[in-house]
Amino acid sequence: MKNTIIKGLTDLVEQKRDNLIRQVVVQLEAQGYKAVLEQATVQQFCRQFALSPVEFALRCLPVAACYALTPISQFNVGAIAIGQSGSFYFGANQEFVAASMQQTVHAEQSAISHAWLAGEKAIAHMVVNYTPCGHCRQFMNELNSAERLKIHLPHSQNNLLHNYLPDAFGPKDLNIQNVFFDGQSHPFNYQGHDPLIRAAVEAASQSYAPYSQAFSGVALQLGELIICGRYAENAAFNPTFLPLQSALNYQRLQGLIDVKVSRVVMAEAKADLTSLPMTQSLAGAHLGLDIEYISL
């Protein structure tokens, strides 16, 4: 079966007949379909086409939407998180057959988690092809850049996040000072030699769980590669992003959807709640695998 991302990008180039889109797709192909444009590449495109970074990102939204996985809704949403570094991190919505609707990844979550795992320190702009839903507005309010974050839509640009979420409730209301995208370090010890377990423990140590202390991470084995995901809590609790979604999203945006996952390890700190049941459910439904669980 043909890679659905490659097929979507190929079809987009043929349908749009847009030189900018064609060149962006060529760039993605050259980097193995990793859905990121580094700052230097962004600057090069902006100079070539006489566009601002936000204008360029708006033109790239159909490309980002090609990374969507929407077997249920058939409604593809693309998002681009522009980091303070100037790099573009693409994201897209993802739905999982035979799993609950609550397991869905929203495009804004996708782009933000992508940037976080890539080491970005703050998000300056969110560019998305449809108005953010309430869930995503609350998710973005957890960011260390929430007060100055700008939202850009095809029909409306330069809107502060808090214009979409007035009188917002967030981490500061719960006396949390070190927020999402601020450095996280919660060292957990693992004395074994299994690199996949070690990677899951390291992901847990960098996760964001100020409300429950249920720090967790997931590591996926893809041939010789390891892909990790991190847990990220939210002041409103429900918009919390689970570590397996984070890992599957990163796998997709690294252009690795054709590489089979053979193992899933989850490492989680002991706390009053756990993400294990939902993680087990999604791993079984989407990957046909059991979770190897490490209690920290």
Curated annotation (Swiss-Prot):
Protein EC: 3.5.4.5
Residues that coordinate or bind substrate: 93-95
Cofactor: binding details: Binds 1 zinc ion.
One Gene Ontology molecular-function label: identical protein binding
Cofactor names: Zn(2+)
Domain CMP/dCMP-type deaminase: 52-167, 191-296
A Gene Ontology cellular-component term: cytosol
GO BP term (any one): cytidine deamination
Catalysed reactions listed for this entry: cytidine + H2O + H(+) = uridine + NH4(+); 2'-deoxycytidine + H2O + H(+) = 2'-deoxyuridine + NH4(+)
InterPro entries membership: APOBEC/CMP_deaminase_Zn-bd (IPR016192), CMP_dCMP_dom (IPR002125), Cyd/dCyd_deaminase_Zn-bd (IPR013171), Cyt/Deoxycyt_deaminase (IPR050202), Cytidine_deaminase-like (IPR016193), Cytidine_deaminase_bacteria (IPR020797)
Signal peptide: none
Chain sites annotated for binding Zn(2+): 106, 133, 136
Residue numbers annotated as active site: 108
Sorted UniProt keywords: Hydrolase, Metal-binding, Zinc
Keyword Zinc: yes
Function statement: This enzyme scavenges exogenous and endogenous cytidine and 2'-deoxycytidine for UMP synthesis.
Subunit structure: Homodimer.
Sequence similarity: Belongs to the cytidine and deoxycytidylate deaminase family.
Listed PANTHER family: CYTIDINE DEAMINASE (PTHR11644:SF2)
Protein name: Cytidine deaminase
Source organism (scientific name): Mannheimia succiniciproducens (strain KCTC 0769BP / MBEL55E)
Source taxonomy: Bacteria, Pseudomonadati, Pseudomonadota, Gammaproteobacteria, Pasteurellales
Gene name linked to the record: cdd
